[in-house]
A protein has these predicted regions:
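Accessory regions of macromolecular translocation/handling assemblies
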Residues: 1-244
Length: 244
């Protein structure tokens, strides 16, 4: 009938909407995988981080970055963001150290050599955050569906250095107040518990990406990525944010 035809026409006309921000809900989806061409993944994440750190006070949102040493030049500017520090402003939740035998050993074994591998110390710090957030006593303080503050966002760009954290994050429990973003080349490498996927590779348009809930891959959202932020401007932004 006419009403049904009108409905179909409206759906077709509004299938693509211009100038509307694409939303990535890190409270609804505790684990997100961003996959595809590494340069485009990097560009997208920089835009996300600029929006995130601009709109959220560093006491409300904390960022934890785990990267391989090869990407240090690309991401070392993050050290200026206030969101990357711990509560005491003594430790940055940012690591580029190589994975070594000492990193995989326990802290007690490393101490026999008179030092503790820097990645092992970083791992211990992050594990303590996760353990606290899994504690029922901690979660009891945040009732009625309220997310704990600060909300932690883990950026996992190193597959090997990420493995030691996966078992503690696999529940996707919103009560923990932790979201994870995995930056991998292919969907195949994402952990099984990853809920939401953003694919930056589109065969027809270099600036188009798709996003979808893992178990509803047929219901994809297409969006146009923002223009890349030059490294110089990204560094300048992070340095300006350090004054907050």
């Amino acid at each position: 009938d006419e009403l049904e035809e009108l409905t179909d026409r409206i759906i077709q006309e509004t299938h693509l909407v211009d100038d509307v921000p694409a939303r990535l809900d890190l409270l609804k989806y505790s684990s997100v995988g961003v996959i595809g061409n590494r340069d485009k993944v990097t560009d997208l994440l920089k835009n996300i981080l600029v929006s995130l750190s601009t709109l959220h006070f560093f006491r409300d949102v904390r960022i934890v970055g785990v990267f391989d040493p090869e990407e240090e030049e690309e991401w070392k500017s993050l050290r200026w963001l206030p969101h990357i520090w711990d509560d005491e402003l003594q430790t940055r939740y940012l690591n580029f150290d190589p994975l070594t035998e000492e990193s995989l050993a326990s802290l007690s074994l490393n101490s026999e050599k008179g030092y503790v591998d820097s990645y092992a110390k970083f791992r211990e710090k992050v594990n303590s955050i996760i353990a606290e957030r899994k504690d029922p006593d901690f979660q009891a303080k945040w009732k009625n569906g309220t997310s704990p503050i600060p909300h932690y966002i883990f950026l996992f760009a190193s597959r090997k250095k990420t493995e030691c954290f996966l078992s503690m994050l696999s529940e996707n429990d919103p009560a923990m107040g932790i979201s994870t973003i995995f930056l991998y080349d292919e969907q195949y490498y994402l952990p099984n518990f990853c809920q939401y996927i953003v694919n930056v590779d589109d065969p027809y348009d270099d600036r188009t990406a798709t996003a979808f809930y893992k178990y509803r891959a047929d219901e994809k959202m297409w969006f146009t990525m923002d223009q890349p932020i030059p490294q110089r401007k990204f560094d300048a932004f992070c340095r300006q944010m350090s004054a907050i």
